[in-house]
């Protein structure tokens, strides 16, 4: 049972919210489009003294886990809807935990960044990403923070939709865990030191 009081009180700052965009169900596990969920699982696995576990939060239609980073309460959330309908659950979980739209951190796949690279930014366009379009529409702003996990562009004439819904290639597979770890590291830097410092460290790596 989720209760606001277990996460924050009047004497402490409210929780931070990290959202991982993904499609639900086993058919989509391991696909490029689901890298945001993989990053959330990595962050949950780092929780001490034991990994954080996800449970269904029916009121917001999200899978939710609670952890701490640098002594801050952090909510990890994955919408249970399909990617192009992510916005409703993201807005609902932000409202439930009293997180301002501009403080929401969204982790997602990014075709305009080379595979294996991670980039951070606040605001900007959605680059054709239907999950981001939905989130922007529901939050009413583009000025949320994005952790962009590079999956590269599709080869040849392959459609973007087909590419992101496929699993990583055999050549890429060995490096996927490093991409996930790097993106999780970037989230922790964001939470600990803020966007500008995190950008400086991540983008110079």
Question: Where do the protein language model's features map onto the residues?
Answer:
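Nucleotide and nucleotide-moiety/phosphate-recognizing core
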Residues: 2-123, 132-147, 154-159, 166, ...
């Amino acid at each position: 049972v989720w209760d606001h009081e277990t996460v924050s009180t009047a004497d402490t700052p409210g929780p931070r919210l990290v959202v991982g965009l993904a499609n639900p169900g086993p058919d989509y596990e391991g696909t490029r489009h689901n890298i945001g969920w993989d990053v959330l699982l990595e962050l949950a696995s780092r929780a001490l003294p034991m990994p954080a576990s996800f449970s269904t939060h029916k009121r917001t239609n999200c899978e939710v886990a609670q952890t701490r980073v640098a002594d801050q309460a952090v909510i990890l959330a994955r919408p249970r809807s399909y990617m192009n309908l992510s916005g409703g659950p993201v807005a609902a979980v932000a409202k439930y935990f009293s997180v301002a739209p501009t403080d929401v951190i969204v982790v997602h796949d990014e075709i305009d960044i080379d595979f294996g690279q991670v980039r951070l930014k606040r605001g900007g366009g959605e680059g054709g990403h239907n999950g981001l379009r939905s989130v922007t529409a529901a939050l009413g702003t583009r000025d949320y923070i994005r952790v962009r996990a590079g999956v590269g562009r599709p080869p040849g004439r392959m459609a973007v939709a087909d590419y992101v819904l496929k699993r990583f290639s055999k050549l890429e597979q060995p490096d996927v865990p490093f991409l996930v770890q790097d993106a999780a590291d970037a989230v922790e830097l964001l939470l600990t030191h803020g966007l500008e410092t995190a950008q400086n460290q991540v983008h110079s790596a």
